[in-house]
Design a protein with these regions (language model features):
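Bacterial signal peptide processing site
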Residues: 22-24
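A conserved helix-loop-strand patch within extracytoplasmic ligand-binding domains
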Residues: 110-159, 263
Length: 279
């Protein structure tokens, strides 16, 4: 009888010990999950920049995972559906337009990281002033991009926009003077624009720097006009669901992406086609 009781006591102790180990492991797994962040990003330059940030975040005990996207719609859908923790591909005016169209999206800007000056390309003409009467300008199907594009044309004296207008909110409908009677075709998906340019379609094609880089174009040398990077409101940002901007992983991500190491990488790698920002 004593032997049976002794065996039972040992067995009970073993069960409790295993249970305790199980509890400890579970807590460790939970802690590890809290130290991971999954970020959705465009291939170039966003995912490349994030790859450089991986070891720096690892030093802070954070595992960065990257999921790449090829368009400008799915990254926000994935964020809303909690498939990713953050995304890195869009600028503030674009985010504002997305939130206006999707009031159920509760997103915030967690921090600006870099600027990609947009370029206007042409195989037929050397400047915007050389564009012919009744010419066609092909651009991306994003209303939030129209203001920045039209501002370049206005700066070159090709068109005029309404006075007193917030240029980031300007659209094709705000053109008040267009002496060349240019047609602005804003119906094209952004990823197709480099191919349209290479096919010599239209008189000018507006291409975002990320798509240009992905297609092997030089966003500084190849365009006939380039947007200025100074006082540029189109900084690409880390976007998260509201409330997550205060999470340790998100704060660390923004801090690392704004670090000297990453800023130096951006400057050296993209040579002005992508410009780092620090605030």
């Amino acid at each position: 009888m004593k032997k049976w009781i002794s065996t039972l006591a040992v067995s009970s102790a073993l069960v409790l010990s295993l249970a305790a180990c199980g509890t400890t492991n579970s807590g460790s797994d939970s802690s590890e999950k809290e130290k991971k962040i999954l970020v959705g990003a465009s291939n170039i330059p966003h995912a490349e920049i994030l790859e450089q940030a991986k070891p720096l975040l690892k030093e802070k005990g954070i595992d960065l995972e990257i999921k790449t996207f090829q368009d400008y719609i799915i990254p926000n859908t994935a964020l809303a559906d909690k498939e990713i923790d953050a995304n890195y591909f869009q600028h503030v005016p674009y985010l504002k337009s997305v939130l206006k169209e999707n009031p159920d999206y509760d997103f915030v800007n967690a921090g600006a990281i870099h600027i990609e000056p947009i370029g206007i390309y042409s195989k037929k003409y050397d400047s915007l002033k050389d564009l012919p009467k009744n010419g066609t300008v092909i651009m991306r199907n994003a209303v939030a991009e129209q203001g920045r594009i039209l501002s370049i044309f206005e700066k070159e004296g090709v068109i005029k926009l309404k006075k007193g207008l917030n240029k980031t909110e300007a659209t094709i409908n705000d053109i008040v003077e267009n002496p060349k009677n240019l047609t602005f075709n804003a119906d094209i998906e952004g990823g197709l624009l480099p191919q349209i340019y290479n096919n010599n379609e239209g008189d000018a094609v507006v291409i975002n720097a990320n798509y240009a880089l992905d297609a092997g174009l030089d966003p500084l040398k190849d365009p006939i006009a380039v947007e200025s990077g100074e006082d540029n409101p189109y900084a690409n940002i880390i976007t998260v669901r509201k409330g997550d901007e205060n999470k340790e992983t998100v704060k660390a991500l923004v801090e690392v992406l704004r670090s000297k190491e990453i800023q130096d990488f951006i400057t050296k790698k993209y040579k002005g086609a992508v410009i780092p920002v620090s605030k």
